[in-house]
């Protein structure tokens, strides 16, 4: 809970003029604090961590810590959420939970700029994908176009007559940017 409240410090920090009023619970600080706590609890509920609201963040499993980081960012009400490798180190179950969370964030109207090697996550949440190979643009398009793009397949899966490329995304490690 404290991690999500810290993210809202701008709305909670009374300015010098209203500082004295805040000490006495006047001037709207109590209301701002209630709103911040409600927002934090809403995000803890959305990431299935409300029951652990008082636990130290460092005591959470790694996947939960990643979702908590995203919830902390969302407590600032961004219009664009920029994420760099949020699925790094996650197991498949945690990656699925992350992708689901990102889809709900998109549904709420927040755009996402994602840099990610987990192409399963990229394909599930992206409208448009830019694929880079060693910093060079090799493809741009929607997920279906990227999945079928020969340059993407060659760069990230290799080319071989023996390769089964029916599902190229399952085993690729491409760097993608999705928004």
PLM region spans:
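Glycine-rich phosphate-binding loops of nucleotide-dependent enzymes
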Residues: 1-179
């Amino acid at each position: 809970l404290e991690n999500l409240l810290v993210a809202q410090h701008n709305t909670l920090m009374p300015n010098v003029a209203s500082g004295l009023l805040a000490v006495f619970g006047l001037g709207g600080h109590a209301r701002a604090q209630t709103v911040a706590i409600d927002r934090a609890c809403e995000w803890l509920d959305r990431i299935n961590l409300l029951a652990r609201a008082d636990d130290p963040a460092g005591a959470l499993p790694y996947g939960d810590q990643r979702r908590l980081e995203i919830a902390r960012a969302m407590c600032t009400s961004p219009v664009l959420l920029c994420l760099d490798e949020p699925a790094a180190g996650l197991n498949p179950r945690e990656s699925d939970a992350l992708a689901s969370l990102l889809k709900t964030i998109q549904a709420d109207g927040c755009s996402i700029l994602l840099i990610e090697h987990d192409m399963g996550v990229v394909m599930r949440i992206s409208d448009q994908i830019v694929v880079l190979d060693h910093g060079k643009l090799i493809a741009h398009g929607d997920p279906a176009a990227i999945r079928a793009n020969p340059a993407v397949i060659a760069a990230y899966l290799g080319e071989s007559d023996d390769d089964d490329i029916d599902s190229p995304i399952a085993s690729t490690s491409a760097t993608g940017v999705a928004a």
